[in-house]
A protein has these predicted regions:
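Active-site entrance/lid segments in N-terminal catalytic domains of soluble metabolic enzymes
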Residues: 1-178
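Residue-level detector of alpha-helix initiation sites
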Residues: 24, 185-186
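Conserved acidic functional residues
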Residues: 130, 183-184
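Conserved active-site-proximal phosphate/metal-binding subdomains
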Residues: 161-180, 186-324
Length: 324
């Protein structure tokens, strides 16, 4: 399936994927995204057990099928994030459940596995893989993924350090599939900019934390709204993998500034526990907080982004008059 065929299959009204966020992304957020014309996603590990995860898939599949039956209209697909790392004992078990229920999109992190891609392709599913550099991108391409998620500097949670402009250009030279760009995207103008750079879809997380449907405390959402770029801390001190967090939440949880540069062995075991107190009090976010000023329902947010996107594209025509 080529890139254009994939884009048509996604059936989007705005080229946006709401990225899967630990704890934050649950069914209400996924539904709201898909019902409003964008892709909603969630981590499999947001359900504490594989049995609970499977129930979520059954619920979504039945609801989406019923919607199509009643309206004759197909919703954009949803996606599930699988952490493909040796410290995640559920990875392959959850994959089997995804294959069983034919999850439309699988987003893989921390490991591009050819056998996984083949299993998802066996039922017509798509695989998108997180990458932070060209070396990881090549491995994912060799594994046969349909899309690469370029996690650039400033993205919330696990993030890279590359500027998005050369990053997209560098990967486009070696990959003609779908490119999703993540990192500090918060509005429709940012979505238009991502496409101007050569990406096909915008991959947006932090903006969706401050919505009515997100599973995030009032304090978390308030800190998102009140923070700027200077308040985001990039550290590997928690799990061994560099990630962006709200600095104030680190300090309040005892991770003071003197600990931010410490080196620890990669271990996602505790991080992947939704009940771990630390992950309810330590909050990830990207530099896109700088332009997030409110909390609102997903429907209103997507509607506003759609108009911002349209205005941004139209405004580019003025530059042709001025400089062409």
């Amino acid at each position: 399936m080529n890139k254009q065929e994939i884009l048509q299959k996604l059936n989007l009204s705005l080229p946006v994927v709401a990225s899967p966020m630990f704890i934050v992304s649950q069914l209400d957020l996924v539904r709201a995204c898909c019902y409003n014309g964008i892709i909603g996603t969630f981590p499999a590990l947001n359900q504490r057990t594989t049995e609970g995860f499977e129930q979520w898939l059954i619920e979504l599949n039945e609801e989406f099928a019923q919607h199509e039956k009643e309206t004759g209209k197909k919703l954009p697909p949803y996606g599930v994030n699988l952490i493909v790392h040796r410290t995640n004992p559920r990875a392959m078990i959850d994959l089997k459940v995804c294959v069983k229920h034919k999850v439309p999109i699988i987003i893989t992190s921390l490991g591009a596995v050819k056998e996984l891609v083949e299993e998802v392709h066996s039922y017509g599913g798509l695989v998108f893989h997180d990458v932070t550099n060209k070396r990881h991108a090549r491995k994912a391409i060799d594994a046969g993924v349909d899309g690469l998620i370029l996690v650039s500097a400033g993205a919330g949670g696990h993030a890279g350090t590359l500027n998005p402009i050369p990053f997209v250009a560098e990967i486009r030279e070696i990959f003609d599939g779908l490119i999703l760009l993540g990192g500090s995207l918060s509005n429709g103008k940012d979505v238009a900019s991502a496409l101007q750079m050569g990406a096909d879809l915008a991959y947006m997380g932090t903006r969706f934390i401050s919505t009515d449907e997100a599973v995030a405390s009032d304090a978390y959402q308030r800190m998102i709204i009140e923070s700027g770029t200077k308040d985001i801390v990039y550290t590997a001190a928690l799990s061994g993998i560099p990630a962006n967090f709200l600095g104030e939440s680190l300090i309040q949880s005892g991770f003071t500034q003197d600990l931010w540069d410490r080196k620890v062995k990669i271990d996602l075991g505790a991080e992947l526990d939704t009940e771990a107190k630390a992950w309810k009090d330590i909050w990830s976010a990207g530099q896109g907080v700088a332009t997030i000023k409110d909390r609102l329902p997903v429907a209103e947010l997507v509607s506003r982004m759609r108009e911002e996107f349209r205005e941004a594209i139209l405004s580019q025509q003025q530059y042709l008059k001025n400089y062409a």
